[in-house]
Design a protein with these regions (language model features):
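Loop/turn elements at helix/coil->beta-strand transitions in domains of secreted/extracellular proteins
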Residues: 132-137, 154-159, 217-219, 240-244, ...
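Mobile cap/lid helix-loop segments that gate and shape the active-site cleft of serine hydrolases
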Residues: 211, 248-300, 321-329, 335-342
């Protein structure tokens, strides 16, 4: 049968609709999951015991599960709500008209207004030679965090130093922190809600000043190590404008799964963490009650999906519980794998080096993620899952929901 020319455009449209949807690597909104209905938050005794790692694809109300990417935003909404309620407290929501920003030479200055009070933030930017715009790495404390600067400087990547103390101190005293001045009714929140709020305000500032920043906002990364590695993880999890998160040696409360850590030795468990970083009420889930926590930190890591995440570990420090990091990273990566984008999540765990001192053997892995996700080089291989010392660990027993 001969096709008329009128039918050809229709056929083209039909064929296009059959093509798989391209999964974004970054978004232009802080949180695309902010418009879903609030879910119920049962008390401790009403929560079911879940001995293994909770299914990241299961609905919170027990009505089933979905592994469709189109449903992932709703899953993110539910996980974030549970994370806020049971672990870190709500990250304050800010309207754009309450923020002012300007460039002061190579320093971005941001002012946030709320309730008649103001909070001032500043971020020094280390620029490469040239006019830009440049991809950029937000580093906790330093322009590139604890990662070697030459990895970024040799690639003409800017570094943005995030001064977290302008938001909240390392061991907060509730009610006396800078953020408490503009949110006096939210003094219960943990630092891992407050610090990511500050990172998001720096990104807001970059958006407000626009081309003056000389920063490519489609290619922003964040990194930090140890407690700052957790900070980077939570920041990447809670702001979808961050294209690449590198969590270096984050330890307990970071990528490590609380449930797995509870089975190990002298490590940072839920009952032995720093509660200035979390809600004080999270302590109710310590020890034998950890199985009642409705989420775990493989889901916190998975909040970064479908964007890029690289997790770095260091087995020389028992407290970091890198076996837990390994199991949780495996479980989190299952989310990326389910969506057919497992190359966007990797992990590398290695010993024989100082804390927060990246060994040369891990340079290529960091460079690969930087090249692919900050410099747009899709040909770079980022299928990195290196933790040879844990090759005999039965991680699958922790994730019965995963595809065998």
């Amino acid at each position: 049968m001969k096709l008329s020319t009128l039918s050809l455009p229709l056929i083209a449209i039909m064929l296009a609709s059959c093509q798989p949807k391209e999964i974004p690597t970054v978004y232009d909104r802080e949180n695309t999951a902010d418009n879903y209905t609030a879910i119920e938050m049962p008390g401790l005794q009403q929560l079911p015991e879940i001995a293994t790692l909770p299914d990241p694809f299961a609905w919170a109300d027990g009505s089933g599960r979905s592994t469709r990417f189109d449903d992932w935003a709703r899953h993110r909404s539910e996980i974030i709500q549970q994370l806020y309620h049971y672990e870190i407290g709500e990250k304050p929501v800010v309207s754009r008209d309450s923020i002012e920003a300007f460039m002061d030479n190579d320093t971005l200055r941001v002012t946030v207004h709320n309730g008649g009070e103001t909070l001032n933030l500043s971020a020094t930017i280390k620029y490469p030679e040239g006019d830009g715009p440049f991809p950029a790495m937000i580093g906790v404390g330093f322009p590139y965090g604890s990662l070697p600067p030459q990895i970024f400087e040799s690639r003409n990547i800017a570094g943005i130093a995030f001064n977290f103390t302008q938001v909240m101190s390392h061991t907060q005293k509730r009610g006396t922190e800078p953020i408490n001045r503009i949110y006096p009714d939210m003094i219960q929140i943990g630092a891992y809600s407050a610090w990511p709020w500050g990172v998001s305000r720096i990104i807001d500032g970059l958006e407000i000043v626009g081309e003056q920043s000389r920063i490519d906002l489609k290619h922003l990364g964040i990194t930090g190590c140890s407690f700052a590695g957790k900070m980077a993880l939570f920041s990447g999890a809670l702001d979808e404008r961050i294209a690449l998160t590198i969590a270096q040696e984050p330890g307990g409360g970071g990528v490590d799964a609380w449930r797995v850590s509870e089975t190990l030795g002298n490590v940072e468990t839920l009952g032995r963490t720093n509660y200035s970083w979390f809600l004080e009420s999270m302590a109710q889930f310590a020890e034998e009650n950890v199985s009642r926590l409705p989420i775990d930190h493989h889901q916190v890591a998975a909040l970064i999906a479908p964007r890029a995440l690289l997790v770095l570990g260091n087995t020389d420090f028992e407290w970091l519980a890198d076996e837990s990091n390994y199991v949780s990273s495996r479980a989190a990566r299952e989310v990326w794998r389910t969506f057919g984008i497992e190359e966007r999540m990797g992990f590398s765990i290695e010993g024989n080096h100082g804390h927060c001192q990246l060994p040369e053997s891990q340079y290529p892995e960091v460079e690969a993620f930087v090249d692919r996700f900050l410099l747009d080089k899709p040909e770079i291989d980022t299928n990195i899952t290196r933790a040879d010392m844990f090759s005999e660990v039965d991680y699958m027993k922790w994730m019965p929901w995963a595809e065998k």
